[in-house]
Amino acid sequence: MMSLSTTLKPLSHFSPFVKRHNPKTNNTLFTLDTHNFTNSFWSKRGGSVSHRKHTVVAVYEAPDHVESSWRRLLSEVVVVRTKRSFWERSWTSWDVSKLVIFVGTHLLSLLAPFYFSWEAFWVFPWLVFINGICITLSYHRNLSHRSFDLPKWLEYLFAYGGVLAFQGDPIEWVSNHRYHHKHCETQRDPHSPTQGFWFSHMAWIFDTSSILENCGGEENVDDLVRQPFYRFLQRTVLLHMMAYSFLFYFCGGMPLLVWGIGITIAVRLHLTFLVNSVCHIWGTRAWNTSDFSKNNWWVAILTLGEGWHNNHHAFEFSARHGLEWWQLDITWCLIRFLEAIGLATNVKLPTETQMKGKALV
């Protein structure tokens, strides 16, 4: 954390952020001015800024060609708009493939009223739950953060379920997420909220070239790349999605395709996206982290515990995100069950000392 000079001036009379130049990178830094913000915002919301120490909670780094910036409503996040348009770039074939899948599932979901059947309808909530578990338990807590270990057969089973959630292969997903934690809320963050709500929510997934340019390749996932199973999934991920869709159509016709693929995938995508967007903008903070991650109770309910995002950013290694007894974390309940029957081992949790060291209160 760094101290903030009292001579710096805020961006505007209502903004708690200060704009200053970084000569080393020739970039602009947006830093939190605790003098004009502590009493007006954090004192009401139990934030982590100390008025006495003038602590900076987070530092945003942006190119100098910033077009405009503003603070998000009811949040301390500053949105930085640059002149580079989303469309003024080259699209890779993988970007186009993801856009086709995204638009296709959403268009398919619009057919739901015309292909309603109770049999297909009841498939929808169960698949949303199963797909969600495979993403939160496997892609996120097991593969991205190694919060616990599973037997290889079970690890691979959950990971394959993540592929069928239409969120890409494990190597790409885990790589992006690890870069998110490494460069959180900076220009190198794959889905920084400083680039706007919709960018952090979903637009970022169609810009793989930018991630490659800002973060690098997949050298941060050597543990997965070394395994033939994950390389196989990376090469064939589209084939699995197509086969999965054809299976639903073969078993239940258009009703099952619409409800089991269209609505299920569209809903699950946006539930996952809420963690990237909403949970870095709105909510409460319990821990002193170098970002604006938030705990959001309603997102936590919808995402099987992922909404306790400030908890997660404070203790990335923790298999449990709902650290309080009242913080519902369905994914953690399943991990505990797997641990109880001997399938989940080396389950990591923060110690009392670690929690006291980061607690705001």
UniProtKB/Swiss-Prot annotation:
Its EC number is 1.14.19.-. One of its GO terms (molecular function) is oxidoreductase activity, acting on paired donors, with oxidation of a pair of donors resulting in the reduction of molecular oxygen to two molecules of water. Keywords: Chloroplast, Fatty acid biosynthesis, Fatty acid metabolism, Iron, Lipid biosynthesis, Lipid metabolism, Membrane, Oxidoreductase, Plastid, Transit peptide, Transmembrane, Transmembrane helix. The keyword Transferase does not apply. A motif (Histidine box-3) lies at residues 309-313. Pfam families: FA_desaturase. Its cofactor is Fe(2+). Residues 1-57 form a transit peptide. Belongs to the fatty acid desaturase type 1 family. This is Probable lipid desaturase ADS3.2, chloroplastic.
